């Protein structure tokens, strides 16, 4: 069984005095972080948490959550990371499904079925001597993260130590590493994008500037004053930052804006090019331990809309009806690599359907061009089929977002007796604009069947904690209308 030294322990040994985590309030070195984690381990040992057991973690970004995630790995327990924005019912369902033995939280939460401990209680509680894992077995499960369940009930994605290691290595081979690197972390750590930064932090020995909750003003300031070199964003965050930037630009020390969470509108990318902001578009999911494809900033304008090529250890192909498709033919995106999950917890059928001979069927639609660059069209489940024609919501959203008075746009399919489905749009506007004007604007830029049949105006669009658009909630709004 392949093993490695315990990552944080090894990092604390190699570069003990280097800053690991910085927040508004404090800075902590790798050695101090390791000591803090060992202390939390002794508290957890008193609670009888043991290797192989599953422990639910319901916490917001902060030093406490970082300590808990590392402490569980020191013990060999599996962290089941819960989304703080879920309803009580959803959280209870996931805890039961994951068979957790207890819940560690920084919130007031009282499930009936398992013991609940707040971080404060744990940290101030009794301690017990503990055997720490000095080595990690790469085949063992480290975390379980539930997919958002765009179709059916959420599924617990098992990610091993090996998956997390391969993900960090693949990213570093793509982006490179610098001594002065500082990654600004504003993505929630219960999502794989946020969690992967914790892994990179200790593997690379890289400073992480931790932002507990999404705060565009602080992030904008930090990029200018805190030596931030890399930041992970989604399109909505990038729009917020550009708004604050106005006619200015960011310092040249910012070498990478890693943009994920779905296709980005062209006008947004063009604005970034004008300002010299290096945007790396990326494609990934929970099942791939975060990114699996990335487009470097060199190709920002020549390959607008592409998510790039697979990371060095990964492979990608397009399949349709079980056959591999040539370039420029649409189909399902299928990926393979050491960062890809081995499957879903207690969901053998879903695992067998999704992962075939190591190839993960993503459920996303796309194509590769003649040079092998990936273009993600949409989620298969978001596809609108109107009169036999495939309509990708992302394409209509891009057109809507190019209108000067549109801040946000979301498109979903509505049942239609004649066509099966027709597209309708939800828009957040920045000034006076009517439904008729929006429809006319689209008619000039889109095929007739792609033009939204209705446009509804909202104050804001529903998004998850990573600021990804929640189309299923737009569908619910549509049903209520």
Curated annotation (Swiss-Prot):
CDD domains, per the entry: OSB_CoA_lg
InterPro entries named among the record's database cross-references: AMP-bd_C (IPR025110), AMP-bd_C_sf (IPR045851), AMP-binding_CS (IPR020845), AMP-dep_synth/lig_dom (IPR000873), ANL_N_sf (IPR042099), MenE (IPR010192)
Tree of life domain: Bacteria
A single BP term in Gene Ontology: menaquinone biosynthetic process
Catalytic activity field: 2-succinylbenzoate + ATP + CoA = 2-succinylbenzoyl-CoA + AMP + diphosphate
UniProt key word Calcium: no
Keyword ATP-binding included in the entry's annotation: yes
Gene Ontology MF terms: ATP binding; o-succinylbenzoate-CoA ligase activity
Record pathway: Quinol/quinone metabolism; 1,4-dihydroxy-2-naphthoate biosynthesis; 1,4-dihydroxy-2-naphthoate from chorismate: step 5/7; Quinol/quinone metabolism; menaquinone biosynthesis
Protein EC: 6.2.1.26
Keywords: ATP-binding, Ligase, Menaquinone biosynthesis, Nucleotide-binding
A Pfam family per the record: AMP-binding_C
HAMAP family: MenE
Similarity annotation: Belongs to the ATP-dependent AMP-binding enzyme family. MenE subfamily.
Function: Converts 2-succinylbenzoate (OSB) to 2-succinylbenzoyl-CoA (OSB-CoA).
Protein name: 2-succinylbenzoate--CoA ligase
Organism placement in taxonomy: Bacteria, Bacillati, Bacillota, Bacilli, Bacillales
Gene: menE
């Amino acid at each position: 069984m392949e093993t490695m030294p315990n990552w944080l322990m090894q990092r604390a040994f190699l570069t003990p005095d280097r800053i690991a985590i910085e927040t508004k309030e404090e800075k902590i070195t790798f050695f101090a972080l390791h000591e803090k984690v060992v202390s939390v381990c002794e508290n957890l040992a008193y609670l009888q948490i043991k290797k192989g057991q599953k422990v639910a973690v319901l916490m917001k970004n902060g030093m406490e959550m970082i300590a808990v995630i590392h402490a569980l790995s020191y013990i060999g327990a599996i962290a089941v990371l819960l989304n703080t924005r879920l309803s009580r019912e959803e959280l209870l369902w996931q805890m039961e499904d994951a068979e957790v033995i207890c819940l560690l939280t920084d919130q007031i939460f009282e499930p009936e079925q398992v013991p609940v401990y707040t971080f404060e209680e744990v940290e101030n509680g009794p301690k017990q001597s503990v055997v720490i894992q000095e080595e990690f077995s790469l085949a063992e499960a480290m975390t379980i993260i539930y997919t958002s369940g765009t179709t059916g009930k959420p599924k617990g994605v098992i990610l091993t130590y090996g998956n997390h290691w391969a993900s960090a290595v693949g990213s570093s081979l793509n982006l490179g590493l610098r001594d002065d690197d500082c990654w600004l972390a504003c993505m929630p750590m219960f999502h794989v994008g946020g969690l992967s930064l914790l892994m990179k932090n200790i593997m690379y020995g890289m400073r992480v500037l931790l932002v507990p909750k999404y705060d565009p003003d602080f992030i904008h300031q930090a990029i200018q004053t805190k030596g931030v070199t890399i930041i992970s964003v989604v399109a909505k965050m990038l729009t917020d930052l550009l708004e604050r930037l106005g006619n200015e630009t960011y310092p040249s020390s910012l070498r990478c804006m890693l943009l994920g969470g779905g296709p980005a509108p062209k006008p947004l990318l063009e604005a970034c090019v004008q300002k010299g902001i290096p945007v790396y578009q990326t494609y990934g999911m929970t099942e791939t331990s975060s990114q699996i494809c990335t487009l470097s900033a060199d190709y920002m304008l020549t390959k607008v809309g592409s998510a790039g090529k697979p990371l060095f250890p990964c492979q990608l192909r397009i399949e349709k009806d079980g056959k591999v498709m040539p370039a420029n033919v649409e189909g399902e995106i299928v990926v393979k690599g050491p960062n890809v999950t081995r499957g879903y917890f207690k969901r053998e059928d879903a695992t067998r359907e999704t992962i075939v001979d190591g190839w993960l069927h993503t459920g996303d639609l796309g194509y590769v061009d003649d040079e092998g660059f990936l273009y993600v069209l949409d989620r298969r489940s978001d596809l609108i089929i109107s009169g036999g024609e495939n309509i990708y919501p992302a394409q209509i959203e891009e057109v809507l977002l190019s209108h000067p008075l549109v801040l946000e746009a979301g498109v979903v399919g509505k049942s239609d007796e004649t066509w099966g489905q027709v597209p309708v749009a939800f828009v957040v506007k920045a000034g006076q604009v009517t439904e008729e004007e929006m429809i006319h604007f689209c008619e000039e830029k889109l095929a007739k069947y792609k033009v939204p049949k209705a446009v509804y105006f909202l104050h804001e669009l529903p998004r998850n904690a990573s600021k990804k658009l929640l189309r299923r909630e737009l569908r619910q709004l549509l049903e209520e209308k």
